[in-house]
A protein has these predicted regions:
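Extracytoplasmic catalytic-loop and juxtamembrane helix elements of membrane-embedded
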Residues: 90-120, 157-176
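Hydrophobic, aromatic-rich transmembrane alpha-helices
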Residues: 128-156
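Signature aromatic-anchored transmembrane alpha helix within multi-pass, membrane-resident enzymes
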Residues: 79-83, 195-224
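Specific aromatic-rich, kink-prone transmembrane helix
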Residues: 14-40, 58, 62-64, 182
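Perimembrane helix-loop-helix junctions
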Residues: 53-82
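Transmembrane helices and adjacent periplasmic/lumenal helix-loop junctions
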Residues: 33-61, 145-149
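Hydrophobic/aromatic-rich transmembrane helices and adjacent perimembrane loops
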Residues: 150-205
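Aromatic- and kink-enriched transmembrane "portal" helix at the membrane-lumen/periplasm boundary
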Residues: 1-15, 45-50, 160
Length: 224
C-alpha cells in the first residue's frame, strides 16, 4: 500500500531511502549491527527528517545490544550522529539555501488549526487512525513486538504533528513508502525469533505451539 501511493505520485527523494532502509532492515534481522549502521548512515543525505530515523535506529541497536558494552556504546554514538545531522540540516543547511533564512517545512502547527495542544495535534483528525491501523497491519500485527518497529516513530510523529493534510493519509502520495521496509523488517525479526524458540521447543516437546503461529504470520503478510 505504501509503494502504490508512491508510484501513483510524483517522484520524490524517498525513492533513495527505501532501498537503504530495506538493506538496513535485512541486516537487523540477521543481527549484523555494523551493516545496519552502514546502510542507515546515508539516510541523513536523503531527507532532512531522516536524521531522526537514524537516531532511532541507533537507540534500537543499543537496546538490542545492551548486554555487551561495545554493542551498546557504538549505537549510542550513532544515535547522536543522527540527531546532530538533523539539527545541522534544519538549522543551518536548509535555512542557508532559503531566501527567507528559515526551514520552510518546520512543524509550526500553522494552517488555521487554532489553539490546540500537542496531544490534540497528534491524534486529531481521525484520519490519522487509518495510518495507525495500516502500520500495525503492515507489520503483521506481531511485528509490533520487535524493537525495529520503533524506527517508524520519528516519521509518524512529524507527520501527525504537521499541518499538511497529505501527511495524515495512508492511501495516496509517497509518505508511507519508507515505512514499508521497516514494517516488514519488524515482522521478519519477530518471525526469526519465533523460529529460534521453536527449534529449542521441539526438544522439549512444545514445538507444535510455535509451529501453529507460522500460518497466521504468512496469511497476514500475504494479504498486505
Amino acid at each position: 500500500w505504501g509503494f502504490q501511493g508512491a508510484v501513483a505520485s510524483q517522484f520524490h527523494e524517498i525513492a533513495f531511502a527505501v532501498p537503504l532502509l530495506a538493506w538496513a532492515s535485512a541486516a537487523f534481522v540477521e543481527g549484523r549491527w555494523v551493516a545496519v549502521m552502514a546502510w542507515s548512515a546515508p539516510l541523513v543525505l536523503v531527507k532532512e527528517d531522516l536524521g531522526l530515523t537514524v537516531m532511532m535506529i541507533g537507540l534500537v541497536l543499543a537496546w538490542r545490544g545492551r548486554e555487551n558494552e561495545k554493542s551498546f556504546t557504538y549505537p549510542l554514538f550513532f544515535a547522536v550522529f543522527g540527531l546532530l545531522a538533523f539539527f545541522v540540516t534544519v538549522k543551518l543547511l536548509l535555512p542557508a539555501f532559503n531566501a527567507s533564512g528559515t526551514w520552510a517545512y518546520s512543524l509550526d502547527g500553522s494552517s488555521n488549526r487554532g489553539d490546540v495542544t500537542l496531544i490534540e495535534r497528534a491524534l486529531w483528525p481521525a484520519q490519522k487512525y487509518g495510518v495507525i491501523a495500516m502500520v500495525i497491519l503492515g507489520a503483521g500485527i506481531i511485528g509490533m513486538a520487535s524493537p525495529w518497529f520503533w524506527v517508524i516513530m520519528p516519521t509518524i510523529a512529524w507527520r501527525f504533528l504537521g499541518s499538511v493534510d497529505y501527511y495524515w493519509d495512508w492511501k495516496h502520495w509517497h509518505y508511507n513508502a519508507i515505512l514499508i521496509p521497516i514494517l516488514l523488517g519488524a515482522l521478519l525479526d519477530v518471525h526469526r525469533r519465533w523460529s529460534s524458540q521453536e527449534d529449542s521447543s521441539i526438544s522439549r516437546g512444545w514445538g507444535w505451539v510455535t509451529s501453529t503461529q507460522r500460518p497466521l504470520v504468512a496469511t497476514i503478510a500475504l494479504a498486505l
